Amino acid sequence: MRAACVIILASLTVFMSPGLQCQPLAGEGDPSLDELFQRAESLLIRSILTQTEDENHGDGEQTEWLEKRQHPGKRQHPGKREDTDYEDEAAALQKRQHPGKREEEEDSARLRRQHPGKRLSLEHMMLEEPTAQSELAKRQHPGRRYLMLLHKRQHPGRRELHEAAGDFSDLAKRQHPGKRLCEDWDVTGCDQASILLELLDNVNKSRAEEKRQHPGKRFALEDELTEQESL
């Protein structure tokens, strides 16, 4: 207690000594309460501003450090990406894709944008755009180019004839060499006996088919045959 009193008395003597007192400037009096409030307010505002600047600077440094540690593709949040970034990525993806897939995606997008009743089929699109036909032919095998288009453009009757001829050739290839139809009489193995046997087999097969048919249909077929023979 005595030590505290001694310290207080020493401080008072130092402050009250005439040599150490500061003389006030001329023209300055005691500050009013308004001036004191304004000074305190300015000091508080400055302290708040400096604190916010320090916090922003610290957050910026932290984000830069975090971006450096992350993968280049994950540095930006997906929801904050701009439209330009999406366009650049789409262009880069299209460059990496095969040209045929690019065109297929464009065609599918075009068909989806159209009204269901106005959607064009692939055949009409290819017939209207010759460039699409040439590009499709380039992508296909040389032996298979334009087969689908030619098949669709042909008359249904001719199409059936071609299909029947193809089925007949496939059937002849699958049959035993001794059972194939003799197209040329000079070929070895196609003698008169084999020809007669084939004719008998055909007659027996036709009779068996007639027996399996309905009697009314059988008579109708016979009438048609007689009419054709009379003509």
Swiss-Prot record:
A Pfam family per the record: TRH
Q: Which residues form the signal peptide?
A: 1-22
Composition-biased stretches, type Acidic residues, lie in 222-231
Where Pyrrolidone carboxylic acid occurs along the chain? 70, 76, 97, 114, 140, 154, 175, 213
- Residue numbers of Proline amide PTMs: 72, 78, 99, 116, 142, 156, 177, 215
Provide the alphabetized UniProt keywords: Amidation, Cleavage on pair of basic residues, Hormone, Pyrrolidone carboxylic acid, Repeat, Secreted, Signal
InterPro entries, per database record: TRH
Q: For the region Disordered, what residue ranges are annotated?
A: 50-139, 206-231
Q: Which GO biological-process labels does this protein carry?
A: eating behavior; histamine metabolic process; hormone-mediated signaling pathway; negative regulation of glutamate secretion; positive regulation of gamma-aminobutyric acid secretion; positive regulation of insulin secretion
Name the family the entry cites. Answer: Belongs to the TRH family.
Role, per record: Functions as a regulator of the biosynthesis of TSH in the anterior pituitary gland and as a neurotransmitter/ neuromodulator in the central and peripheral nervous systems.
* PANTHER family linked: PRO-THYROTROPIN-RELEASING HORMONE
Q: What protein name applies here?
A: Pro-thyrotropin-releasing hormone
Which organism does this record belong to? Carassius auratus (Goldfish)
**Gene (UniProt):** trh
